[in-house]
């Protein structure tokens, strides 16, 4: 078991519905610590860079529009096997297929507005964290 970090975004649907505290409670109840957190308005350039892996996908434009439609909360989470743990806590991308007790089952409205993003690997977590945080921003 390795102590590691992962990156999280509470998406505009979460901030719009004022459920960020409830989502954070689920994260912390799962044993993950929030060691970096900031509420920002993602720019178009930030969203396009962050989601560039999806650039050729048909939903890319809608995704960028959604992610820039309101404030988001970017986070650094830390804990034992944080990447896998947070992916488990988030639940399936489609909230209708997410397990009971997961963030997406409890809070997500649709596949497009599914409340949270989490890194899919430790390597990607490092890249994603570096896009929004410096080492000085993280209080471990």
Curated annotation (Swiss-Prot):
Give the UniProt keywords, A-Z. ATP-binding, Cytoplasm, Kinase, Magnesium, Metal-binding, Nucleotide metabolism, Nucleotide-binding, Phosphoprotein, Transferase
Q: Where does ATP bind?
A: 11, 59, 87, 93, 104, 114
Kindly report the protein's main subcellular placement as a broad class: cytoplasm
Give one GO term, molecular function aspect.
Answer: ATP binding
Needs which cofactor?
Answer: Mg(2+)
- Enzyme active site: 117
What is the protein named?
Answer: Nucleoside diphosphate kinase
Q: Which organism is it from?
A: Methylorubrum populi (strain ATCC BAA-705 / NCIMB 13946 / BJ001) (Methylobacterium populi)
Taxonomic lineage per UniProt? Bacteria, Pseudomonadati, Pseudomonadota, Alphaproteobacteria, Hyphomicrobiales
């Amino acid at each position: 078991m390795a102590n590691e970090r992962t990156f999280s975004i509470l998406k505009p649907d979460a901030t719009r519905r004022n459920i960020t505290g409830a989502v954070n409670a689920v994260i912390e109840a799962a044993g993950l610590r929030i060691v970096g957190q900031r509420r920002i308005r993602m720019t178009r350039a930030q969203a396009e860079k962050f989601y560039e892996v999806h650039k050729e996908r048909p939903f890319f434009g809608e995704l960028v529009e959604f992610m820039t439609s309101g404030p988001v909360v970017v986070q650094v989470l830390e804990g034992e096997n944080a990447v896998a743990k947070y992916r488990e806590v988030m639940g399936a991308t489609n909230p209708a297929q997410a397990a009971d007790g997961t963030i997406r089952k409890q809070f997500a409205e649709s596949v497009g507005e599914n409340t949270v993003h989490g890194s899919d690997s430790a390597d990607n977590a490092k890249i994603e964290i570096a896009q929004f945080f410096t080492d000085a921003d993280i209080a471990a």
